[in-house]
Regions:
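Active-site proximal loop and beta-alpha junction motif in alpha/beta enzyme cores
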Residues: 1-70, 75-264
Length: 264
């Protein structure tokens, strides 16, 4: 069975930057074990699987290791595929997901995705995280993910993690966001997941569900410009609107093709 697949760089206007996601279009759901094999074979941070059922798109996300409950950049990539390749006459699409309905809209300049607002609260840092860090944070908070706040952008950029120690803890489906005020934007971040095939995520939309409310309150701003300073880098505009976080970003298609899924 030949199945359509798209590879998209999300939260960027340029190829080979942002965060790459694969979007696989399925006629119906196949066993979870096979979804995981496809995600592992794709070897990108996340693969989004789409099924049209009853006139609605149903969306699931897989890393090379597990199914996860939310993925911002793969949702943006899926929205880009639908609105650019499948239904270019439309400007919005809704996805049914384990985290509820997620909307992706397109205007003249960017895509907008609405994700759950997850304000972080003060927390204790597990020793397997603190001992793995080359520099301790000024502040520790937690929602789904741990949020570690540093004094400067350079501290975030230079931070090193001892993977052997870091991998002693399992935070599925969460991870660790490290953040600081930015020099030429409102805030910067990096994101790490222990025990994951890909430890540092290039751009993490879901982490901004907690980063955005934190920095919005701290800076007293509604609209924030953010950069994730991974090796690929990515840019987002973020806003808190009630129980949602609005993320604005671009996406570009890298490849279009088919994969072979043999019948069992």
């Amino acid at each position: 069975m030949n199945t359509p697949i798209y590879q998209v760089d999300a939260f960027t206007e340029r190829l080979f930057s942002g965060n790459s996601a694969c979007v696989v279009l399925l006629a119906e759901w196949i066993p979870e074990s096979k979804l995981l094999k496809i995600a592992k074979e794709n070897a990108v941070a996340e693969t989004a699987f789409l099924v049209m059922n009853g006139g609605e798109y149903h969306l699931r996300w897989f890393t090379p290791d597990i199914e996860i409950d939310l993925c911002g950049h793969a949702t943006l990539a899926a929205g880009h595929v639908v609105l650019t390749h499948l239904a270019p006459d439309k400007n919005a699409v809704q996805f049914r997901t384990i985290s509820g309905q997620l909307d992706v809209e397109r205007d003249d300049t960017a895509y907008r995705i609405a994700l759950p607002n997850r304000p972080p609260v003060p927390a204790e840092l597990p020793s397997s995280i603190s001992e793995s860090l080359s520099l301790q944070p000024q502040e520790v908070l937690k929602a789904r993910d741990y949020v570690l706040v540093y004094a400067s952008e350079s501290q975030v950029a230079d931070l090193q993690i001892n993977r052997e120690i870091f991998d002693r803890i399992n935070l599925d489906p969460g991870g660790v966001a490290v953040t600081a005020a930015g020099r030429d934007c409102d805030f910067v971040s990096r994101f790490f997941t222990p025990q994951a095939t890909i430890m540092e995520d290039p751009v993490t939309g879901s982490a901004h569900c907690s980063l955005t409310p934190y920095w919005s309150e701290r800076l007293g701003k509604k609209s924030l410009e953010a950069r994730q300073i991974s090796h690929r880098g990515g840019e987002l505009r973020c806003e808190v609107t009630g129980d949602q976080v609005q993320l604005f970003g671009n996406a570009v298609t890298y490849s279009v093709g088919h994969i072979r899924i043999d019948e069992d």
